[in-house]
Amino acid sequence: MRSPSAAWLLGGVLLLAASGSCNRTVPGNKSKGRSLIGNVDNSPVVAGRGVTVKPGFSVDEFSTSVLTGKLTTVFLPVVYTIVFVVGLPSNGMALWVFLFRTKKKHPAVIYMANLALADLLSVTWFPLKIAYHIHGNNWIYGESLCKVLIGFFYGNMYCSILFMTCLSVQRYWVIVNPMVHPKKQANIAIGVSLGIWLLILLLTIPLYVVKQTSYIRALNITTCHDVLPEEVLVGDMFNYFLSLAIGVFLFPAFLTASAYVLMIRTLQSSAMDESSGKKRRRAIKLIVTVLAMYLICFTPSNLLLVVHYFLIKTRGQSHVYALYIVALCLSTLNSCIDPFVYYFISQDFRDHAKNALLCRSVRTVKRMQVSLSSKKFSGKSSSYSSSSTSVKGSY
């Protein structure tokens, strides 16, 4: 269990770094907000007749360095581009395999199909996010699209957490109760999946209610979600994200870790022969890998999110936002890792994915299977006839 421990250690290191950074001050800056807090800019602006001046916000030096630095204008778009290029085709193919190539809709298949759909819906909007960061964190697509982007972004993260939790609990349930009827399990999985989508839809409503765009007059840019008024950050957003972190991350993470630990104990305590032992060791390695990926992708971002808003609420300043957006960006790598997890978990998915990459139709695959089975049968029958002939000759 070294990998999960490493995940928690990584979260602890980020937390210590964040705590240390919040004590630094910027010389000559007396602004209260040290994170991306927007204060209403009431400075006089000289404008010609007929020229409309947009109401804007002012930000401090730290926020300015984040909005104009290489971290947000180079690093973030590079990572998001990689996730988009890898995640779009891989999740699209995964969803196609689950929906149209997999005949037996087991609960695991249902959860993985929903997970692929959540990743696909999120990755589809990445070009807008990439363009936003490349153009100096300047959002030109309007308030409505900004809300949709943010809603899908956070919705995908918590959808992934919940569906991966369902997968872990379902896999443990199958090991403990192997005699439960698959059809009954599939119906339960469909109901749970619909419930998760409805829950995420309700949980993301506040993101559509709060105004997400802010015009920064000094930089002449319009940010999307990166700069919000201080009263919104301290009040609404603090309570909202704290509830999400506890209810939709911490509790599911505890369930996921518990299910996988119990699964490993059950597999280790079961008596098996040598061939089954190899499969058991492979299953345990896969379980540890999936659990480590889960914790590494989602723990730092959710931990730093709570720390960021807590520091704003208690101290009125925070330098954690830069670390948080990096952790949040790296958590999106989960969207392009998930299809490879499907590949190693499911033998059916491996076969269908290989056939899809080789452009084989379902009919062609069936013909190949019939041909191989007939060859095996003919080989067995020929060996039987030859052995019977030799027996006759001996008499």
Curated annotation (Swiss-Prot):
Post-translation changes: A proteolytic cleavage generates a new N-terminus that functions as a tethered ligand. Activating serine proteases include trypsin, mast cell tryptase, coagulation factors VII and Xa, myeloblastin/PRTN3 and membrane-type serine protease 1/ST14. Proposed subsequent cleavage by serine proteases is leading to receptor deactivation and include neutrophil elastase and cathepsin G. At least in part, implicated proteases are also shown to activate the receptor; the glycosylation status of the receptor is thought to contribute to the difference.
Keyword terms, alphabetized: Cell membrane, Disulfide bond, G-protein coupled receptor, Glycoprotein, Immunity, Inflammatory response, Innate immunity, Lipoprotein, Membrane, Palmitate, Phosphoprotein, Receptor, Signal, Transducer, Transmembrane, Transmembrane helix, Ubl conjugation
Pfam families cross-referenced by the UniProt entry: 7tm_1 (PF00001)
Propeptide positions: 26-34
Signal peptide: 1-25
Topological domains annotated Extracellular: 35-69, 136-147, 210-233, 316-321
One GO term of the biological process aspect: blood coagulation
GO molecular function terms listed in the Swiss-Prot or TrEMBL record: G protein-coupled receptor activity; G-protein alpha-subunit binding; G-protein beta-subunit binding; thrombin-activated receptor activity
Protein's UniProt name: Proteinase-activated receptor 2
Lineage: Eukaryota, Metazoa, Chordata, Craniata, Vertebrata
